[in-house]
Amino acid sequence: MLKTLRILVISFLILLPNTILYAEEINKPGVASAHPLATKVGYEILAQGGNAFDAAVAISATLSVVEPYSSGLGGGGFFLLHDSSSMEDVFVDAREKAPSNANRDMYLDNDGNVMRSASLDGPLASGIPGLPAALHHVSLDYGTMPLYKLLQPAIRLARDGFPAYERLITALLVAEKSRTLSPKFKEIFMPDGKPPVVGQIVRQPELAKTLEVLASSGHTGFYDSFFTQKMVEESNQDGSIWHLDDFKSYAVTERAPINISFLGAKLTMAPPPSSGGTTIATILNIISQFDFMGMDSAKRAHLITESMRRAYRDRAFNLGDPDFVDVPIDKLISMEHAKELAQSINLDQATPIHEDDDIDGKFALNEGAHTSHFSVLDKNGNRAAVTQTINTWFGSGYMLPSSGMILNNEMDDFSAKPFTPNRYGLVHGEQNSIEPNKRMLSSMTPTFIESDRGVAILGTPGGSRIITMVLLSIIDYFNGGDAQSMTASKRFHHQFLPDVIRHEKDAFTNDVKEDLQIKGHNLQEISNYGNMQVVTFDNATGETESSSDPRGLIEGFEIDFY
């Protein structure tokens, strides 16, 4: 039975305006994910009477099976949830943790240089997984259906298989040439010594059994059982430093989201250990100091770039796990701080790198197609924005033999050595150094927008570029964009170091590129990136629109979603 969504005037934080949402009812739910099979599962759960949180659990588990290069039970994620009955938002932090045996210099050689492959390949690169804990927690605390039922679609797809598709095959070809892949990984995904062909059925029987353990025994079955002991033994035999107590002590953490006001709307975003919310808040606060909406395209691009530069510098020097370090969130997202940063921007010239910022190192900014995001809105107005990951394509490249889980390589998201760039060219300071049981900094940025127009639920994969992709989609929304334009619009990125604007083809006109270069910007055209997933709801019409990024569309699945 449809329930009418009537949202009264709510007073948020003092810094936020009162926002009135006046929809009569939500005519249909919305689901957007990176794989058609996961989207189908989400709609099926909603059709069975489940809420957005039930659907989120089922979608998350399904993506762990059918999109194994992006996320999985061997990784972690962030769940941004909105409960329409209580009007409360919560951020469920299921980020991986460093093992208790981890130490600050574990990826340095005898000369103090970073051994990059050690934090990328094999089980030594793996943090303690958090996604299974999140599935149990979200289902138990926010869902209406039993976890056992929610995991059945993923179990079937792992056991019975799904057709291989171009994106999976491409990821396997790249991994085969560039990564060290474990024997069990090759057995599952390259049974004939090579990747499957399109349409060939991919089965993961051990992963199906792992999902069954989680479905029947929940958190305890995964984190404190004979199953856990077997995982630890296998990974340690191949080089990890896991301890059984690392799993027994793992728990998700609920945190207050980052909330800011922008152009009269409320933005709800991910807090640390995500760097997304604070970084986007800083950028939007900076550009709000100018007549941003009245600028021409060239001035806008320059201002956004200069704001990105400053916000990413803040990220490098200030952010880390808030349970371990003092993160000055209130200062970073304050208007006073934004005004100070805005005053340092010259609208006619790019900011040269200060000599203190010219940190030694090669800043290889790798392509960002990793990680996965999905967005859900149910008919009662509950919503979920979920980003989950194992870091790079296929994580560490190591699959646990008995459980069929691909382990993450999230330890590379720590600062192995302060201000030495990681896989994504990002630099971090002491705040993000390795410590036992610490969560590594992340760029994942699940986001809600609430305005007088309605609601938008969004997020994307893309490594260090996640933040700027979400930022540009937010700006597109305020320019009148819809779900399709938010996923399809062209992108550009600056992350403080390296000092270059990386942009998709046609992100700028020739005139804008010339203007930016005259101002002193370095430009580099790159291939398309990201896989934005957006659901919007229009207050005036009650209509829902779901859109998946055309850059990541998976073909070959004829599915009627709704």
Spans of features found by a protein language model:
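Extended C-terminal subregions enriched in glycine
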Residues: 438, 470-471, 479-527
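Noncatalytic scaffold domains of N-terminal-nucleophile
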Residues: 24-40, 44, 52-224, 228-271, ...
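M16/insulysin-pitrilysin zinc metalloprotease superfamily fold
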Residues: 277-292, 449-456, 463-487
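Active-site rim segments in enzyme catalytic domains, especially the processed small/beta chain
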Residues: 65-82, 86-91, 241-243, 383-451, ...
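Short, small/polar residue-rich loop motifs at catalytic or cofactor-binding pockets
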Residues: 254, 368-371, 393, 442-444
